[in-house]
Amino acid sequence: MAKKWVYLFTEGNANMRELLGGKGANLAEMTNIGLPVPQGFTITTEACTQYYEDGREINDEIQSQINEYIGKMEQITGKKFGDKQNPLLVSVRSGARASMPGMMDTILNLGLNEEVVNVIAEQSNNPRWAWDCYRRFIQMYSDVVMEVGKKYFEELIDKMKADRGVKQDVELTAEDLKELANQFKAEYKSKVGVDFPDNPKEQLMGAIKAVFRSWDNPRANVYRRDNDIPYSWGTAVNVQAMVFGNMGEDCGTGVAFTRDPATGQKGLFGEFLTNAQGEDVVAGVRTPMKISEMEEKFPKAYAQFKIVCNTLEAHYRDMQDMEFTVEHCQLYMLQTRNGKRTAQAALKIACDLVDEQMRNEEEAVAMIDPRNLDTLLHPQFDAAALKAAVPAGKALGASPGAACGKIVFTAEDAKNWAARGEKVVLVRLETSPEDIEGMKAAQGILTVRGGMTSHAAVVARGMGTCCVSGCGDIVMDEENKKFTLAGKEYHEGDYLSLDGSTGNIYDGQIPTVDATIAGEFGRIMGWADKYRKLKVRTNADTPADAKKARELGAEGIGLCRTEHMFFEGDRIDAFREMICSDTVEEREAALAKILPVQQGDFEKLYEALEGNPVTIRFLDPPLHEFVPTEEEDIKKLADAQGKSVETIKAIIDSLHEFNPMMGHRGCRLAVTYPEIARMQTRAVIRAAINVQKAHTDWNIKPEIMIPLVGEVKELKFVKKIVVKTADEEIAAAGIKLEYEVGTMIEIPRAALTADEIAKEADFFCFGTNDLTQMTFGFSRDDAGKFLGAYYDAKILENDPFARLDQTGVGKLMEMTINLGKPVNPNLHIGICGEHGGDPSSVEFCHKIGLDYVSCSPFRVPIARLAAAQAAIAEKQN
């Protein structure tokens, strides 16, 4: 039996997301529960994958099924493609299994040609509407299918409006729009070299190909990488009978949410435009009216719409984002999906759904994207400074948060300025999906047009970027990179501050303060802690970082990098003296100066952690990182050591290495300079003794971590120094103190010989930054130069330094556990690379049985939530 590539809406349901994509599955589900949905069919995600396998062509079998289903659609609707009496017009929309707002392409009014336009103009007695549909179709088809830029058509529209002395598209007459359609076709021919296609089936195949092709466009690829959506999923294509919101004042189109996507507040929230079509609301071409105003215009349709909203939220048990059209006062539902929301809204909605008995605690925890918590923990404006500030303008607060930066006018400039360390605010007439990388780079986004559901608003909310939209008071001059607001001219590089919660726009810079976390955060985190099995620690080198991490729920320090402490104040001078010493005695004298300050640092960390575990990594970087490079500093070091400048320079030159990341660093330093390991051990143990004496109810148990071990004899050598020194200190203090000595697993050989190393180690901690570097053979510092090409060539989908490579590096981790645990059942194992705060990596760590993950302080809540979700998912499976 031939494979099924196409499904009518009546043949699917909500559980078929993988095959029909989110939009197709939900259109089928809405059809099944009896909602007013214009009928159509879905071409599966498998057909998209097949399209790429067949060299970006739709094969005969799939084309044949599409034609068969056009016939079925004609029977259902009673209309025919290209018919002179009753023509069928359709929309063609993408629909991946994960929602990707604005990332892929849509075409409306497909099936039109000049003959059909004349038929529908006469039948409807509304020639203006007919020609409006046709000019829109030509523009969309040219842009999406033939890649003729929208701007050429926008210029023609602007010229037409200027010639006619009008401001809005809706003010153009039927004759104007007919003339515009002919101008558009001429523009198409001048750019493409052939006439605009008249055959509806040819149009349809072109549109379906274009949607499949858009799965691989740059903005979709960036969005997928950022949101962990595999390339292999593909997108479905939905072909749906058109309904028209642009047939007159008794028609309209809108987008609505069942709860406020910015705050989570229950209640209908959205926007509506009369005499408009499809993308008009989202595209921000006209600033729309509030959804509540629809009640006055279309009381019957609005009453029905409210019932539909309640039905859908109860059915999906989540906040819904819906698109709809009203045609001659009749309501039609075009889409529903679980709505994108801010982090604050996500927490409130999850808690409210539990309180409303629509969800249980585990489901509430599983609903929240851990990555979004990042946005909760970032600064807001200082309240006093904000009170004193006078807004220069006000628009819609489309995505909460505070942003301050220098004004830029293009996405490209935003990206380039941010790359050189500038904080920028991107100011645009309106954003489009092409602006995605610039939007990511910006601190905040300000648009002149568009509402709360415009592209800028939806994408900014998803990214957690502050956004203010629809500031119609701005007079924009993009060409000269300036705008005027409230009588003042702003130029590129001027400072601007945005409040994404209130929509206020401020001249200049307003200082920011750390965010305060709402009560729902505590509830969700409490539930997460109840269900997770993984412990969550933090990577912290200072008491301030440790304190912040504890506030955010860290249960210990998984990595304290001791080398960071050497750079503070005048201690770097003593460390440089140690490096440039000729004898062990000279080195020990220099280290003696460092010992008390390092001990003091450790005491403060133990105090901040209140008896929770602290893992201290001994010196790791190569020594050349600590030596001076400035002439003045070299002279100062020479004077301090009583040596000539030439001698110091010779020592510095001798430290140069061709491949320092694999050179004289980590445990190799302790082997060549055992006195460094002795000093660090004394500092760790003396600090622990002092804090234990001061807090007898705490259980201080230092964890000393030896870096870069690849051979068990290295660990034995350094461990012997540590144990001898530690035991001497403990005996001298006359106190009972336990400590552990473990190692980082960051060299592939350590993973391969983990059974030998486990006999000597009390714990393992995966240093996945170096383990990734050495497994791939990629330099962490240089990979950025070629990773972009790897993404484009589909060699890699994600940055392996940000998201754990589970296939290769992950296999080494599993091997380490399987070799180490049988030899040493008490061995505890964690991870302290950057991956410790990445949700998909945390899920993998849970799956392979790690005891803890460790991440930067602000990512602790992300790790806590991701760990809970991993445990809940495992239980459900």
Predicted features along the sequence, with ranges:
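Protease-associated
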Residues: M358-A441, N504-I510, F521, M525-A528, ...
